[in-house]
């Protein structure tokens, strides 16, 4: 085996590294800070640590100017993210999340692009009660954010239930294995008695006292569906099914969507397949990959700290060699697989063992009641009688899963009663849309996303109808900033917020999530967006080959250049 010399980059540690170093395994002064009733906010050092506990301090940006005028502090509130490996939740857990959303949050539930629940608008004084109730529901927020392994994604594919069940178990085991071991979470939120420190005991055998240089994301896909966007993950596992059984996983490393506007040294990148492992080797592979990033990731410049930059700096071959050295065995050659799409399949689908699954379209992943659409109430009533489970999808939708044949009629009646929709009366474009939260709660947002994309799609749908493309599946994604929470540049049409009402527009991503999009127009508003799409969709309708996807067409037609690797994304 070729020998490589790996080194971590030079440079002083970032301020976040100092905060972690001084935190005593994520404790900091959080306990005292949360008991302080003078302010609804918390100091920045504690806010950095709060992420590891699954929460961010935010403020309502719609109210910011008015509160400044009144000489009031910002309308501080917390976002709480709940870890649900593989997006699977029991009906009892759904009911608990529903109750907490109405009792302590803003009355809505957000289903995220990583198959987790999010609460918005939780006040500081309600944080402890909320986290204790989440714990009582046998869920946790620990490591839902922060420089650790985040929620492990897993394909909730209702077509392959037997394989899904097995793959889900591996997702859950991965999640459990990579959870931080510190007791800080339990002491601060769950009133666990602090055990006297014993210096000879390693509190974090995998992470160490400094945890990882940056967030780390893992996802498992089951072909032909790439709904988890496996190539966007730091570590992706592609399930290989042979003769109806799970043979193992192809291993892909080094994906990540985030970048910084105007900084060409930052870029999105897709994970690359480096080999195959058996199911029982998955935990070992994941742990060793995480420790490589722990040891060689950039702890000086956070915007260069993701695993993708570690790989591009040191070389894929060097990282693979180091992985195999740490494993003590070599990965097998990658096995053939084929992805066909990265969207959801809506409505009723028959599974195995006489069970059924209903995939519900939830625009923007926002579960709430409106005057004409009692979505939250309907799901609450379904959860009261449902004997299967709920599966949050990576596209912010929901599968009412494992409905026994004898209960399908009852479930269907509830779906009809509350007008719950599979989205089939919407355009295929809308059904394949994805948006991050953005304004008013996200502190990083430069423009609207979740609140604006449905309105923009209303106008794009007119163009789609004019060109006979209503049932043509095209993925469209919007984020309020370039960080990539909605995996923006994997949308065939993508918008990244630049300033209020202005977006960078990207085209040319692959429908199956295997190619990044390319910058097409910079800093444009709605009028220009619609003008460009009128021309593009008209050309697509007239000039496309039979079965040709929109993302493939714009490259063949010379409208944008193909992105072959993240390192030439800006070329």
Curated annotation (Swiss-Prot):
GO terms for molecular function: 4 iron, 4 sulfur cluster binding; heme binding; metal ion binding; NADP binding; sulfite reductase (ferredoxin) activity; sulfite reductase (NADPH) activity. The keyword Metal-binding applies. SUPFAM superfamilies: Nitrite and sulphite reductase 4Fe-4S domain-like (SSF56014), Nitrite/Sulfite reductase N-terminal domain-like (SSF55124). [4Fe-4S] cluster binds at residues 436, 442, 481, 485. Its EC number is 1.8.1.2. Siroheme binds at residue 485. Keywords: 4Fe-4S, Amino-acid biosynthesis, Cysteine biosynthesis, Heme, Iron, Iron-sulfur, Metal-binding, NADP, Oxidoreductase. This is Sulfite reductase [NADPH] hemoprotein beta-component. The gene is cysI.
């Amino acid at each position: 085996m070729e020998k490589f010399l790996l080194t971590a980059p030079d440079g002083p540690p970032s301020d976040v590294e100092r905060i972690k170093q001084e935190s005593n395994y994520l404790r900091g002064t959080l306990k005292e800070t949360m008991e302080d009733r003078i302010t609804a906010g918390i100091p920045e050092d504690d806010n950095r640590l709060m992420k590891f506990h699954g929460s961010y301090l935010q403020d309502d940006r719609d109210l910011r100017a008015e509160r400044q005028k009144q000489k009031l502090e910002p309308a501080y509130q917390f976002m709480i993210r709940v870890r649900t490996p593989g997006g699977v939740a029991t009906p009892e857990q759904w009911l608990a999340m529903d109750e907490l959303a109405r009792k302590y949050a803003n009355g809505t539930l957000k289903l995220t692009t990583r198959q987790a629940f999010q609460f918005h608008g939780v006040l500081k004084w309600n944080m402890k009660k909320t986290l204790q109730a989440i714990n009582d529901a046998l869920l946790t927020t620990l490591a839902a954010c922060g420089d650790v392994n985040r929620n492990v994604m897993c394909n909730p594919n209702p077509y392959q239930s037997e394989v899904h069940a097995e793959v889900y178990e591996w997702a859950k085991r991965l999640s459990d294995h990579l959870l931080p071991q510190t007791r800080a979470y339990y002491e601060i939120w769950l009133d666990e008695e602090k055990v006297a420190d014993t210096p000879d005991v390693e509190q974090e055998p995998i992470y160490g006292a400094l945890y990882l240089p940056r967030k780390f994301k893992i996802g498992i896909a089951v072909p032909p569906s790439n709904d988890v966007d496996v190539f966007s993950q730091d570590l992706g596992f592609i399930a290989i099914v042979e003769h109806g059984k799970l043979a193992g996983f192809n291993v892909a490393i080094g994906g990540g969507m985030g970048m910084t506007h105007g900084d060409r040294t930052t870029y999105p990148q897709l994970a690359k397949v480096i080999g195959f492992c058996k199911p029982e080797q998955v935990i070992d592979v994941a742990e060793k990959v995480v420790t490589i990033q722990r040891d060689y990731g950039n702890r000086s410049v956070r915007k260069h700290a993701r695993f993708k930059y570690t790989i591009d700096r040191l070389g894929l071959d060097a990282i693979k060699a180091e992985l195999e050295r740490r494993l003590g065995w070599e990965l097998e050659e990658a096995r053939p697989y084929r992805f066909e799409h990265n969207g959801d399949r809506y409505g009723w689908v028959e599974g195995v063992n006489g069970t059924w699954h209903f995939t519900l379209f939830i625009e923007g992943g926002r579960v709430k009641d409106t005057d004409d659409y009692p979505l939250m109430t309907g799901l609450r009533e379904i959860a009261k009688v449902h004997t299967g489970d709920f599966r949050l999808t990576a596209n912010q939708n929901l599968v009412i899963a494992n409905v026994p044949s004898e209960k399908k009629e009852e479930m269907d009646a509830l779906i009809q009663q509350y007008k719950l929709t599979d989205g089939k009366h919407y355009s295929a474009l809308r059904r394949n849309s994805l948006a991050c939260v953005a304004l008013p709660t996200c502190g990083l947002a430069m423009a609207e996303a979740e609140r604006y994309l449905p309105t923009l799609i209303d106008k794009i749908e007119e163009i789609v109808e004019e060109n006979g493309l209503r049932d043509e599946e095209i993925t469209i994604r919007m984020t309020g900033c370039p960080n990539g929470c909605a995996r923006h540049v994997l949308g065939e049409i993508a918008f990244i917020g630049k300033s209020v009402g202005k977006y960078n527009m990207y085209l040319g991503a692959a429908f199956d999530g295997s190619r990044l999009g390319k910058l097409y127009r910079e800093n444009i508003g709605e009028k220009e967006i619609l003008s460009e799409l009128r021309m593009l969709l008209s050309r697509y309708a007239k000039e496309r080959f039979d079965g040709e996807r929109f993302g493939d067409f714009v490259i063949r037609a010379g409208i944008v250049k193909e992105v072959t690797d993240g390192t030439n994304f800006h070329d």
